[in-house]
Amino acid sequence: MRHLRDQSFFRLLVALAFVGAYTGVASGRTQVTCSFPAGQQPQPTEYFASLADNASHLAHVSIRFPQASGPITLNMPVWNALYQVRDFAANIENVHALLEAGQFVPVIHTKTSEWLVTAPASCVVVEYDIHLNAEGPFGAQLNAEHGFFNWAMVLLYSPSTRAQKMSIQFLDVPPTWSLHDVHVMGEASPGKVEQAAGIAANYDQLVDSSAEVGVFQHFEFQEDDATYHIVVHAGPGDYDAAKLEDILRRITHAEVDWMADRPFDSYTFLYHFPRGHGAGGMEHAYGTAIDVNAQRLNRNMMPVASVSAHEFFHLWNVKRIRPQSLEPIDYQGIMNTRALWFSEGLTSTVGDLMLVRAGLYGERQYLDRVASEISELQLRPAHRWQSVEDSGLDAWYEGNAFYRTPERSISYYNKGEVVGVLLDLRIRQLTHGRKSLRDLFHWMNDNYAKKGLFFPDSDGVQQAAETITGSSFAEFFRNYVAGVRELPYNDFFSFVGLQAAETTVRYATPGFTTSANLGGQPEVATVEANSEAQRNGIVVGDRILQLNGKPANQNVDYEVSRMREGASVKLRVAGRSGERNVRLKLVTREEQAFVLQNVPQVIPEQRAHRDAWIRGDDENGGVQ
């Protein structure tokens, strides 16, 4: 401990010497001052992000308050994108502030994510450096190749000006880099990025507009009188641009048609296709940021179609049809919500239906997808005691490897999607096919989103279902949303001539299962007792870095399950003892699974109900 203290003391001396000699600008960075170009109307808060040190993963942020009324409190969000407290302030260093004449004013670090700038009523510029090297749509990254900015991980904000207009501008951008963001800044070609200042209505809107700067591919298409931008940061050989555009044309048309609503003129799909681990998407009101593993993409375009359909529907469900429990956004603490089963789970329900409607899934593919979700739910013992509402409330635990085990928790994505399927079928049963989930979303869009209102979590969804059907849904929500009653699948599927039947499946396993950690890497979630994995020291929490010499992604379990019994897999594993190579022989396991199959005799009425259901249509030809 003495050695560590000596190092800290040395760093303190260096920092003090730096402050004494500081002239207000580091080498290669543009100085932000209180001088304004003639005729420019300053905003209450003005952000500048210098990329001069991009190769070091450092962004230099300047915040100008042209008319500060006195001391300024600044906060850094502790969470964003994921329902996880991630303490982004840990990446900040060298916070200081200067007045109009260039003199320093004291900055006091009052809390872990809070600073107080003790400035008089004057123009003030606050500066700091922030380390950005978190990959994926839930991160922010800056390096010699590109920059991806999830602004809530980058920008301090003042509670006193958070609701006011603010501007954002890049500085010191490499000359070959372009810009495209989701909404606020738009796009800029090489050499013009620094002139592309964007203005947001408030901080919430600004951080809902992720930005990509670097060398990337950009193409666009028109559909339903809207412009869709596709921005791809990847090797040109890692994806098929024509196929990607065709998929997105189909999805966007299907969903806009299904909702009979298009609350935007322009929408941006911002993709990263990394060679390493990568999976997931982050929704925005006017776009989405999505990561899909490049090797997986080359084999099959459906992963990108699936996540794109899900994220695109979020522009309605959660971004506009929004639960009251998520408003106003509290960037400084946990937000307790029981609505994620609807906001995430039913987004998956609709996303999969839209793949059918778009002609990307056939009936069998869709039914197999639903059956796999049922199987996943039923195989998690925790479904017997954790409700789908509570799984959303407990989302903040998902960074804990034990919490993600089947014995401890279910997924609000998984059960939410299954409950969404059953809710759709129940609405159809009660109305003889004349109403459906489509009508429920139309009602919520009309009565909440378009009126600028937030729905009261599960009670709001129940009210919508009861209003469009004229029937009570109290028992459904009590038993299957708030409660843990076993889902009587065939009471619902019989309406469309189907039954959920149990079967036995065989698959190869290395003796452990994984789940994705916050960084998107596969992390060991369970280890079988007396398995070869256990004998080789694999423990819960270990990270799987490589599978057979290639970077591992979130689909390790699926990739291994497709291999033959007796095959060997070579793993690169990282744990408490460091990184090591492990070779395991696969064994075969059997488990129960569900399939959706026809009832013994499907009558024409059931067939008609099914055809409308998997298209997402009402049987009267559409929503009335």
Each model region followed by its residue ranges:
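Non-catalytic architectural context of zinc metalloproteases
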Residues: 39, 52, 61-66, 81, ...
